[in-house]
From Swiss-Prot:
Disulfide bonds: none annotated. The record marks H99 as: Important for activity. The lineage of its organism: Bacteria, Pseudomonadati, Pseudomonadota, Gammaproteobacteria, Enterobacterales. Substrate binds at T49, C50, N51, R52, S109, E114, P115, Q116, Q120. Belongs to the glutamyl-tRNA reductase family. PROSITE patterns: GLUTR. It catalyses: (S)-4-amino-5-oxopentanoate + tRNA(Glu) + NADP(+) = L-glutamyl-tRNA(Glu) + NADPH + H(+). This is Glutamyl-tRNA reductase. Possesses an unusual extended V-shaped dimeric structure with each monomer consisting of three distinct domains arranged along a curved 'spinal' alpha-helix. The N-terminal catalytic domain specifically recognizes the glutamate moiety of the substrate. The second domain is the NADPH-binding domain, and the third C-terminal domain is responsible for dimerization. Pfam families: GlutR_dimer, GlutR_N, Shikimate_DH. Transmembrane segments: none annotated.
Amino acid sequence: MTLLALGINHKTAPVSLRERVSFSPDKLDQALDSLLAQPMVQGGVVLSTCNRTELYLSVEEQDNLQEALIRWLCDYHNLNEEDLRKSLYWHQDNDAVSHLMRVASGLDSLVLGEPQILGQVKKAFADSQKGHMKASELERMFQKSFSVAKRVRTETDIGASAVSVAFAACTLARQIFESLSTVTVLLVGAGETIELVARHLREHKVQKMIIANRTRERAQILADEVGAEVIALSDVDERLREADIIISSTASPLPIIGKGMVERALKSRRNQPMLLVDIAVPRDVEPEVGKLANAYLYSVDDLQSIISHNLAQRKAAAVEAETIVAQETSEFMAWLRAQSASETIREYRSQAEQVRDELTAKALAALEQGGDAQAIMQDLAWKLTNRLIHAPTKLLQQAARDGDNERLNILRDSLGLE
């Protein structure tokens, strides 16, 4: 059994590739079923966010394992293998464990130490539990990563400063508009990232917030919290002209805001500028919108410079966190190795018990037939001893014949011989 982590993220692939490799929530079960149908895969978890798509797997070792899994990923998303290989990373066993712990702790995030990723990892794991998780080692690896992430957050200052993609989006808005108290903001979506954006905006006393979402009930809960108006996604075209700032983050596979829609809004606004921050993957706003005069479009990749500015105070904490991850990875791998030994021990004990039961049954049968008890017990002891020491004796003899003193000493130690 081998543990694997493979995928792409914001450091290895542009958003144009990440959106093609992402797994939409409504097709995740289908993807997991397809993945687990691969003969080498024993268990799997798919983590797909704005900034990464990763597969965490428990697999049987085989020739061309990497090629087979890359081929599956490319076939599933209709991708060119060469395009994917340039951006793909591949971690195995110790490195896979360490990678997951770093991801869950926010150490591999676009925003160092951001807490949202832990919830996303937990959801990915929960989704895999719906009839898809088959490997206890993989399950244990995820459970361990959750406890490591909690330890990192409580024992270090990794989460001390408020930096996230949501915070960066609001920072960008404050840099462009002198005061948010005079602007109208349209939020498209009502997921976790938009919730954070809305709360940041409320803290900065934005004049008016409008939330557009496919599901009105979810949007209304957020709107009640932050004092916003709720509209349907189908109303975005009509209401877009009211918005000075548009921040969008949905799970839509296709763009929601097109170039024509923004052109009409700008015309109604008499070309007053609009800031559009698209933090969705796949993108919610057509890239061509950025070519329009007075439309300032930023994607998740464009937020990098803002985020980088806020990282200084987290870097020292990250060093401490990396030490924790290294320690916990080492402990997990020790547990994993012990599991392998435990299976061997169980097999060895079971074999010895079979020999014992077989010889004991024969001895009891002989006693029932009136045989001499002392002779039967001596015969049982002699046969039991010979059967149990037969295999170790052959190994000792072979090591001696080979002149392999190191193996001979290992066997002596394992048999408790001084």
